[in-house]
């Protein structure tokens, strides 16, 4: 309850002060613990010829272990996103393999489309996007980004300063 949250906040602030006494902390984010589902990685990088390229694959701790990914230049259509997902070796996990509940593949595809459209629309400003994991919940329950990073292109002024 509230007492546990307050105690956790005090521990976080004390640890931050001990490790980085000059840090400016504007607060902490409290979010519900979400369990279950299948973790994907969804991201973009900028290719000098093709522009933003979208990547999707098995995410979380397995992203670098299995390297099961699909790539497509942005923007990606809904049909294209579904094809990317179905091309993955891990698609069986999303499709209900071995008695697992089917995942909300449509929500995952919509997330891929949204990321690809954002990357294309902001191609002049955004170098990379990394959502890992995108937690794809059971069918009909959606997908949620649990961690995300957007890396901007280096500005000309910062490049000139180097």
Q: In which residue ranges do the predicted regions lie?
A:
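ATP-dependent carboxylate/acyl-activation modules
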Residues: 1-162
């Amino acid at each position: 309850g509230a007492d546990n949250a307050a105690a956790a906040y005090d521990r976080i602030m004390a640890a931050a002060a001990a490790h980085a006494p000059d840090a400016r902390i504007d607060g902490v984010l409290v979010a519900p613990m979400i369990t279950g589902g299948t973790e994907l990685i969804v991201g973009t990088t900028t290719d000098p010829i093709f522009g933003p390229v979208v990547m999707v694959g098995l995410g979380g701790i397995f992203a670098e272990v299995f390297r099961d990914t699909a790539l497509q230049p942005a923007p990606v259509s809904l049909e294209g996103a579904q094809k990317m997902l179905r091309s993955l070796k891990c698609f069986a996990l999303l499709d209900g393999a071995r008695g697992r509940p089917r995942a909300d593949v449509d929500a995952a595809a919509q997330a891929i489309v949204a990321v690809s459209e954002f990357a294309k629309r902001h191609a002049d400003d955004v170098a990379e996007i990394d959502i890992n994991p995108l937690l794809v919940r059971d069918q009909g329950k959606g997908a949620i980004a649990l961690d995300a990073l957007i890396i901007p292109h280096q500005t000309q002024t910062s490049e000139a300063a180097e």
